[in-house]
């Protein structure tokens, strides 16, 4: 019997097959990866959208701050012009400035001999010309409105408040600046 000793004995039952390890992804792993990538991209898109919106708001607020400061400077210019023109007692330092308690606009492009620079506020929008100057002359309309309110609490003081209003993506915004001007002459 040794004659067949080189023959391997057959094992009874199932013999395991040699299976190589699979290197691909399962369907579940693929779906999880797609979900993670989608959530990440949505987060990035949301951050970009908010950044663009806040950049627009910041730009508008900066413009509003400059327009408010310009409104105060216009009122200061009228007061200083009154001083320089050596107004008489009948034409005081605050001439042309005391009729704005309900609100005025500063139309410095208005030309007449009396130069009524402060006119009644009626919700007018500022316009911008080709050089970037804001005024009420017929140019390109903007989203900004400027309202100048001047109160005279006593003989030697004017309280100047400038409100800038605008709307951004359907939401109203405003910016205010205040200054006290005195008859220090």
Question: What is each stretch, according to the model?
Answer:
Residues 18, 27, 34-37, 58, ...:
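N-terminal hydrophobic or amphipathic segments with adjacent small-residue motifs
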Residues 66-185:
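Low-complexity, Gly/Pro-rich coil/beta segments used as flexible assembly/activation regions
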Residues 25-69:
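Aliphatic-rich helix starts adjacent to a transmembrane/signal segment
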Residues 1-25:
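N-terminal leader/signal peptides at the extreme start of proteins
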Residues 19, 30, 46-49, 108, ...:
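Residues at secondary-structure transition points
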Residues 14, 22-25, 29, 97, ...:
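Intrinsically disordered/low-complexity terminal segments and short unstructured peptides
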Residues 8, 21, 41, 48-51, ...:
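Ubiquitous "structural anchor" signal
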């Amino acid at each position: 019997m040794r004659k067949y000793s080189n023959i391997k004995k057959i094992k009874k039952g199932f013999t395991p097959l040699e299976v190589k390890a699979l290197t691909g992804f399962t369907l579940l792993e693929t779906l999880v990866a797609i979900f993670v990538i989608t959530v990440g991209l949505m987060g990035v898109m949301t951050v970009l959208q908010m950044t663009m919106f806040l950049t627009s708001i910041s730009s508008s607020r900066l413009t509003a701050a400059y327009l408010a400061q310009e409104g105060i400077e216009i009122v200061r210019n009228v007061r200083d012009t009154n001083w320089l023109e050596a107004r008489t007692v009948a034409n005081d330092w605050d001439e042309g400035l005391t009729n704005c308690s309900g609100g005025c606009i500063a139309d410095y492009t208005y030309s007449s001999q009396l130069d009524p620079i402060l006119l009644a506020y009626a919700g007018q929008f500022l316009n911008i010309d080709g050089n970037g100057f804001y005024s009420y002359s017929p140019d390109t309309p903007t989203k900004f409105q400027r309202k100048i309110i001047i109160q005279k609490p006593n003989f030697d003081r004017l309280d100047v408040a400038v409100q800038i209003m605008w709307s951004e993506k359907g939401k109203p915004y405003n910016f205010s600046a205040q200054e006290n001007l005195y008859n220090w002459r």
